Regions:
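Core Rossmann-like FAD-binding/catalytic domain of the broad FAD-dependent monooxygenase superfamily
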Residues: 1-205, 297
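Helical substrate-recognition/capping region of FAD-dependent monooxygenase/halogenase enzymes
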Residues: 75, 145-364
Length: 364
């Protein structure tokens, strides 16, 4: 791909079809040579833009100037579409690639990889930076637990167990999204001479394009891929209960172990996340007066005995939050992922098994 960053305040021309963030263009190879598509991205809603010129595999290096390339991409299936360009900031080429490290850690578990160092994906869906941030969030609290002395030997092992499968998931859906974007050209017979026509043929072609885009917009609406994945690792306490099935398009809140704890506003307008601590947090929903329940007391005593920092958040009268969370007791990690959930624990030994596994000391 050819990538061009530039500045332009020619909004009359650039916003001819309205304001946008990303706009994709289909190019006719009989008109545009090796170009098979293009896109423009609004970087700051003011004057900074990026144009991508999608080149066919094995194509020759373009000899067009940066300005000519911009005009050709913006013109799409028609002729060049000139705009006033104030500055060409940078022009470069890049090749989309998908790569995944075999391991996220060294053999002695003293070196860890995160972000682009261990995975690459294509931009479709916007998963790349989110993957890196989640890597850091996942690894950061585990490193802190080891340094602070309360993390067990299995804690750092769980980093790769949890994050590498998520990278595979994101890479898969990034490829799916990219295929849908470029698939329009084969799904709909495009004709540059009638796409803007005011007659029935033009209306029919535009309707077909509209229907394809609306039914293949998962790169913008894939909430299940972003929020609905589950961690499987040694520090996640297995549950006999069922969890919502994975749906790439939609996210169903759940506190089943391994999933991200659901966001919800409490009665006072605060977010439940604001109640969490920097280490493990036990959220318990209470019917009576505030204060740890018997289950909460078991967890508190176990945490004290094993020097595991634990915040207990007792919520009274939070029927809406409890309905969404679906359990009376939920153990949440510092990265807001659920370690365990249940309606009660029968003894301190039960709480001990849960807490020691969540901290990486044992795996039952």
């Amino acid at each position: 791909m050819v990538l061009i960053h530039f500045k332009s305040r020619d909004l009359t021309r650039l916003h001819r079809r309205g304001r946008f963030w990303h706009t994709f263009f289909l190019l006719d190879p009989t008109i545009s040579g090796d170009s098979v598509g293009g896109a423009i991205i609004a970087q700051d809603e003011v004057d900074t833009w990026t144009v991508h010129d999608f080149r066919a595999p094995g194509s020759k290096q373009s000899i067009s100037s940066a300005e000519e390339t911009i005009y050709r991409v913006l013109g799409a299936m028609g002729g060049p579409y000139p705009i006033t360009i104030d500055e060409i900031i940078q022009q470069s080429t890049w090749t989309p690639s998908i790569a995944l490290a075999k391991s996220y850690t060294g053999p002695l578990h003293r070196v860890f990889l995160a972000g682009d160092a261990c995975h690459q994906t294509i931009p479709s869906g916007g998963y790349g930076m989110n993957m890196g941030i989640a890597d850091a969030f996942n690894l950061g609290w585990k490193l802190a637990a080891m340094i602070q002395g309360w993390g067990g030997a299995r804690l750092l092992l769980s980093y790769e167990q949890e994050r590498r499968p998520v990278a595979e998931l994101m890479q898969h859906w990034g490829k799916v999204h990219a295929g849908k974007l470029v698939g329009l050209a084969s799904a709909v017979t495009l004709n540059a001479t009638i796409i803007d026509a005011s007659d029935a043929r033009g209306a029919e072609l535009r309707q077909k394009i509209h229907e394809y885009v609306q039914s293949n917009d998962a790169h913008n609406q894939c909430f299940g891929v972003e929020h609905g994945y589950q961690y499987h690792s040694d520090i996640t306490v297995k549950s006999a209960s069922s969890h919502p099935p994975f749906d790439p398009r939609s996210y169903t809140p759940t506190t089943h172990p391994g999933f991200r704890a659901p966001h919800v506003f409490l009665n006072d307008g605060s977010a439940i996340f604001d109640k969490f601590g920097k280490t493990l947090t036990l959220v318990e929903f209470m019917d009576g007066v505030p204060g740890p329940s018997s289950g909460g007391s078991f967890f508190r005593d176990t945490a004290d005995e094993h020097h595991i920092p634990l915040r207990i958040v007792s919520l009274v009268g939070e029927a809406n939050a409890q309905q969404i969370w679906g359990a009376r007791l939920v153990l949440v990690r510092p990265d807001h992922c659920v370690s365990w959930c249940g309606n009660d624990v029968g003894s301190k030994d039960d709480a001990k098994r849960v807490l020691l596994q969540a901290a990486g000391h044992v795996c039952w």
